């Protein structure tokens, strides 16, 4: 079960634009990550490759956690707001919920829930 301090350290890294560092420090070696109902990616190497590809496809990414962070035993739910510029130079704003299952200080499973329609450019 993660402590509030552990989860807050994770959030601060993501908000600082250090998603790969957060992944290295806080995800278990056999962790899985899933976008909505898509097939999960499994293993830290696959998660890292996916995160690196996502970061390379955008610029000016900002991430903000919307408090409160919900922590109940090994389950953590974080509401994120992201703003970035996509590969076509369009500003994109989206929100998601990250549902995480932790073991101690490491994330074992993470599933993101969001509306894919948010990925279109802002009017």
Residue ranges and their predicted role:
Residues 82-84, 102:
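Hydrophobic beta-strand positions in extracellular immunoglobulin-like domains
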Residues 72-82:
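A short hydrophobic beta-strand element
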Residues 57-60, 84-93:
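Short, cysteine-centered beta-strand-loop-beta hairpins and adjacent loop/turn segments enriched
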Residues 95-121:
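Short beta-strand edge/turn micro-motifs at domain boundaries
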Residues 62-65, 79, 92-98:
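Short, surface-exposed coil-to-beta transition loops
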Residues 6-13:
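Solvent-exposed, amphipathic alpha-helical segments
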